[in-house]
Amino acid sequence: EYRLEQDQVHWIATGFLAAMTVGMLLNAWAVARFGSRRAFLLAMAIFIIASLVGGVSNSFGLLVLARVVQGVTAGMIQPHAMITIFQVFPLHKRGQAMGIYGMGVILGPAIAPALGGVLVDVWSWRATFFVVLPACLLAMVIAGRFLPDHREEQAPRLDWAGLILLSLGLVATLWALASGLR
């Protein structure tokens, strides 16, 4: 649809992964600043909006931007799951809970490409953005009802300069690796 070269297409996945790294760094600050429930719900709401934007995008730039926003928010959501496991489960059940969570983390990337291929064959690549929405909405309802809302009295300062420099460094490194010997 967009008539892209291979060195452009990789930014759809690479942008997500690089942004996910940045999101993981933002998570601790967001939880301390807004509370665990609000930080999770905010990240999930933004992820849903980014999924909708990605699914209806009419340009490659907007598609990559949607994936980057998805990556930042997914990076905030993933460690939040581990925090929640430690908050909710008693010590003697944490190993089992982390094992179940870990299975999802491992199986997701193993199953997603095949499922994505089926969705693309049956409908369109846009369906890959919409298929996650019911689970995200369900997660928001459950989190809104049951997620503990721990919040620190004194939220740490976010090192914006460090975060921006890390982000730029990641993009520069990935750009160099993607460009190769061209």
Segments and roles (model prediction):
Residues 1-145:
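Transmembrane-helix bundle of Major Facilitator Superfamily
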Residues 121-182:
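Hydrophobic transmembrane-helix bundles of small-molecule transporters
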